[in-house]
């Protein structure tokens, strides 16, 4: 074991407040020797933004330890685009910046890709323009399939829905549980799947992503999925722990003491 990929909401944060054991987990990871990254489907904040949010909750984590679905989406677009690098982006500044930094020009006409994330400025014109461009041949890409985030916040899947209904075309979702997101995170850490653990609270995103990518998986019961939910799934996590407090001894056992 050389590395840990860890979800944020439901593992270390809940409604922007630290969960039990969060500070101890963060401090332990920062001391080493494990490489680690906090992986989130939330596309509307940069790593620096997330680091500030964590700091407000008393968790000191440098920005370089965060990887988002916006970053993975930009990486996916780079690999797919070839010489076609023109995109219409529906999203906040973090996604727009990631796509721009990937070498794309941003436009609302004659584009190669329509990229949808999350934005508080979502409106009729955005829906109409996105649908029009997709119907004219633009490829439909979305950051993540989640319909709702913490506190019932509308997430990417909710923004995608009307565009999908109008066009009759489903997007390619980059974020968890897509294996592309996991491979991007592994590359970010510089490790192989058999050297890394996936820690998360959601069977439908975190755990299935880890299972499909060949990682050891740990379900933390302080978030979305509970032990009683497991009967609904054909797959299982390798480990189940109550919270981050219970995760620490497990990590110490597997690494010979952190």
Regions found by a protein language model. Name each.
Residues 40:
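Conserved phosphate-coupling serine/threonine residues in phosphotransfer and NTP-handling enzymes
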């Amino acid at each position: 074991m050389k590395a840990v990929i860890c979800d944020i909401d439901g593992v270390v944060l809940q409604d922007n407040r630290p969960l039990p054991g969060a500070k101890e987990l963060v401090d332990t990871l920062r001391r080493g020797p494990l490489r680690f990254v906090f992986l989130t489907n939330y596309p509307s904040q940069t790593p620096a933004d997330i680091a500030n949010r964590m700091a407000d909750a008393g968790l000191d984590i440098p920005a370089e330890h965060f990887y988002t679905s916006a970053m993975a989406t930009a990486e996916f677009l780079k690999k797919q685009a070839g010489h076609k690098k023109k995109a219409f982006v529906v999203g906040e500044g973090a996604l727009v910046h990631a796509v721009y930094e990937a070498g794309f020009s941003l436009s609302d006409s004659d584009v190669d890709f329509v990229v949808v994330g999350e934005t508080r400025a979502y409106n009729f014109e955005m829906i109409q323009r996105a649908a029009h461009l997709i119907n004219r041949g633009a490829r439909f890409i979305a950051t993540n399939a989640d319909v709702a985030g913490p506190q019932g916040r509308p997430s990417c899947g909710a923004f995608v829905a009307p565009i999908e209904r109008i066009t009759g075309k489903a997007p390619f979702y980059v974020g968890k549980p897509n294996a592309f997101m996991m491979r991007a995170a592994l590359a970010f850490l510089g490790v192989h799947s058999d050297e890394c653990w996936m820690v998360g609270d959601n069977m439908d995103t975190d755990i299935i992503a880890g299972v499909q990518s060949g990682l050891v998986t740990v379900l933390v019961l302080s978030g979305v999925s509970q032990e009683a939910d497991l009967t609904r799934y054909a797959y299982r996590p390798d480990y189940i722990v109550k919270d981050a407090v219970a995760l620490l001894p497990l990590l110490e056992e597997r690494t010979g003491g952190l």
